[in-house]
Amino acid sequence: MDDKILEGTTTVGITCKDGVVFASERRASMGNLVAHKVAEKIFKINDHIVTTIAGSVGDAQNLMKIIEAEVSLYQMRNNDKISVKAAASVTANILRSGPMYVQTLLGGMDGDKPSLYSLDPAGGMIEDTYISTGSGSIVAYGVLEDRYHEEITTDEGLEIAVRAIKAASERDTFSGNGYLVAKVTKDGFEMLDKEKVNDIVAKI
């Protein structure tokens, strides 16, 4: 059964002084097969909330659609933006309601305040300053533990996140095929283009 499921692997999220940064590689695996080399693993929920996925691609895509709908519904009912913590709680409730083979990072900005949450397939929710998910996370955490400090900016955070994904891609056979990199600041969401990502990779 497991070799019939498309899986996404290594993702990273880091809180910074001025925002939250996210990075992932792009490989989707089916057992030992590299099924896709351009998998999307970072998703914009709205201008101040972003999620990443690791696990079953089908479950993850379904979860993203539900989160987007729930967040939009909240904002229509309350005529206000949903907080990052509330969006994480909504996601946790969705995961508790039915089995989904996916681990999600959800983070963003409430005004000037960055926050980041990890959500497991059973709906467990943990807030932290930096988090990695997926099969390459054990390698990525080595980089994060070594380089993270509380005063980092998003520019520094982007470099650390890419470095962590690069290390995971070199050691984990289920990670690789390039990078997706994004950030959220008080000015909104940005998915970095290929040129900016290549500039970061060149520095490390």
UniProtKB/Swiss-Prot annotation:
Q: Which residues form the active site?
A: T9
Instruction: Show the propeptide residue ranges.
Output: 1-8
Name of the protein in its database record: Proteasome subunit beta
The protein's job, in short, is:
Component of the proteasome core, a large protease complex with broad specificity involved in protein degradation.
Q: What is its main location?
A: cytoplasm
Q: How is its activity regulated?
A: The formation of the proteasomal ATPase PAN-20S proteasome complex, via the docking of the C-termini of PAN into the intersubunit pockets in the alpha-rings, triggers opening of the gate for substrate entry. Interconversion between the open-gate and close-gate conformations leads to a dynamic regulation of the 20S proteasome proteolysis activity.
What family is this?
Answer: Belongs to the peptidase T1B family.
Note the subunit structure: The 20S proteasome core is composed of 14 alpha and 14 beta subunits that assemble into four stacked heptameric rings, resulting in a barrel-shaped structure. The two inner rings, each composed of seven catalytic beta subunits, are sandwiched by two outer rings, each composed of seven alpha subunits. The catalytic chamber with the active sites is on the inside of the barrel. Has a gated structure, the ends of the cylinder being occluded by the N-termini of the alpha-subunits. Is capped at one or both ends by the proteasome regulatory ATPase, PAN.
Q: What class of enzyme is it?
A: hydrolase
> What InterPro entries does the entry give?
Ntn_hydrolases_N, Pept_T1A_Psome_bsu_arc, Pept_T1A_subB, Proteasome_bsu_CS, Proteasome_sua/b, Proteasome_suB-type
Reaction(s) catalysed (UniProt annotation): Cleavage of peptide bonds with very broad specificity
Q: Which PANTHER family match?
A: ATP-DEPENDENT PROTEASE SUBUNIT HSLV (PTHR32194:SF0), METALLOPROTEASE TLDD (PTHR32194)
Q: Which UniProt keywords apply?
A: Autocatalytic cleavage, Cytoplasm, Hydrolase, Protease, Proteasome, Threonine protease, Zymogen
